[in-house]
From Swiss-Prot:
Keywords: Disulfide bond, Secreted, Signal, Toxin. One of its GO terms (cellular component) is extracellular region. GO terms for molecular function: toxin activity. This is U-scoloptoxin(16)-Er7a. It comes from the Eukaryota. Belongs to the scoloptoxin-16 family. The keyword Lipid biosynthesis does not apply. It comes from Ethmostigmus rubripes. Residues 1-26 form the signal peptide.
Amino acid sequence: MTSTRKLSVSCLIVFMVSSLIAVSSGWLSIGKIAIKDGKCDPKNGNLYAIGEKWYNDEDCFEITCVQGDKGSVAQQVASCPVHAVKPGCELVFPGGTYPKCCPYYECPNS
């Protein structure tokens, strides 16, 4: 195998592995949240200490109260992976609490 072909195969393998990691791991974001008594206040009637989690089942999120910059608190939101369209398959939204609520494809003959 030539060195150019080896490089092409190596690049393809790296691309495929990184694509699988990106698809299987969903996404995370960190954002501002109201603070009350040093805790996260998502305005749902509850206060959450740093490290505590709560769930938004409607949007399929897991939210964690985290330590922000300079003593502030923030919310870290985890959500489901984004799926590419799979022709001939049906995207299923199972409901439930994150991560069980994450959509998935149901394909015939699979």
